[in-house]
A protein has these predicted regions:
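Phosphate-binding glycine-rich loop
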Residues: 1-17, 28-33, 41-43
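Short N-terminal helix/helix-N-cap motif within the alpha/beta-hydrolase-1
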Residues: 4, 23, 77-78
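Short acidic capping loops at alpha-helix termini that bridge into adjacent secondary structure
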Residues: 14-17, 63, 148
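Structural detector of well-ordered beta-strand residues that form the stable sheet scaffold
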Residues: 19, 40, 93-95, 124-126, ...
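Short, acidic/turn-prone active-site loops that include or flank metal/cofactor-
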Residues: 24, 44-48, 98-99, 169-170
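Structured binding elements
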Residues: 36
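Active-site phosphate-binding strand-loop segment of PLP-dependent enzymes
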Residues: 47-101
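PLP-dependent aminotransferase class I/II
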Residues: 66-70, 79-81, 88, 100-225
Length: 225
């Protein structure tokens, strides 16, 4: 059953609010609208890129009926905190999972991630976590007066690294969902994140080439969250 069906089956529709992340997944906001409810955006945890329980609690109202939690880039959301919030407030908590990969592929990506974690400089590498499958290896490229994310991406693409910006525009900035809300971590993540290649089929030489291309730009500061 899809998100629309699950919301309708739970009796959620006209007059209800459903909290969703604005960092990606415009399709979720669309599905909330199709169910007849109003999508409300909450900020993310800067380490997980998933909904932050404190931020969800802050935007929940008497009209809030559900929260849709998205597991991001292969890292599980903090379901314990969000589940407890749902129980306390009487909210339906739905999970929006990512496509799974064979165990061998996941194991190779995890090994690649460990290699990159120990060798990349000038970018903030993803925070390791139990169960992280590294569907995408997402780093931060803060500006700090030095090469920003977009300039960094152009430079390493020029060296043959196939990187991509995972979320170009947060959902609350799209014309059809524009909201006058303050989501600083969502905005910062959209400005700073860059997905580097981590396919299980990559060779050690390809990983070394990736590291060399990134580290050649060197010296970016890594501010704390």
């Amino acid at each position: 059953m899809g998100t629309v069906g699950m919301l309708k089956a739970a009796g959620i529709g006209l007059g209800d609010e459903v909290i969703v992340p604005a960092y990606g997944n415009a399709d979720l906001a669309d599905e909330v609208v199709l169910a007849g409810a109003l999508p409300v955006f909450a900020d993310i945890d800067p380490a997980t890129y998933c909904l932050d329980a404190t931020a969800v609690d802050a935007v929940a109202t008497a009209r809030t009926a559900a929260v849709i939690v998205v597991h991001r880039f292969g890292r599980p959301a903090e379901l314990a905190q969000l589940g407890e919030l749902g129980r306390r407030r009487g909210l339906l908590v739905l999970e929006h999972g990512e496509s799974s990969a064979p165990y061998g592929e996941v194991a190779r990506r995890q090994a690649h991630a460990k290699y990159l974690d120990g060798r990349l400089t000038g970018v903030r590498t993803p925070e390791p976590a139990r169960g992280h499958t590294y569907q995408e290896y997402v780093v931060r490229v803060p500006g700090n007066g030095r090469p920003d994310r977009d300039a960094f991406a152009r430079a390493i693409r020029g060296k043959g690294v196939d990187c991509r910006v995972p979320v170009k525009t947060p959902v609350h900035r799209l014309p059809e969902f524009r909201r006058n809300v303050v989501l600083p971590e969502t905005e910062r993540a959209a400005d700073e994140t860059l997905a580097l290649p981590i396919q299980g089929s990559m060779t050690r030489r390809e990983l070394q080439r990736l590291v060399s291309a990134c580290n050649a730009l060197g010296g970016l500061l890594q501010p704390a969250f």
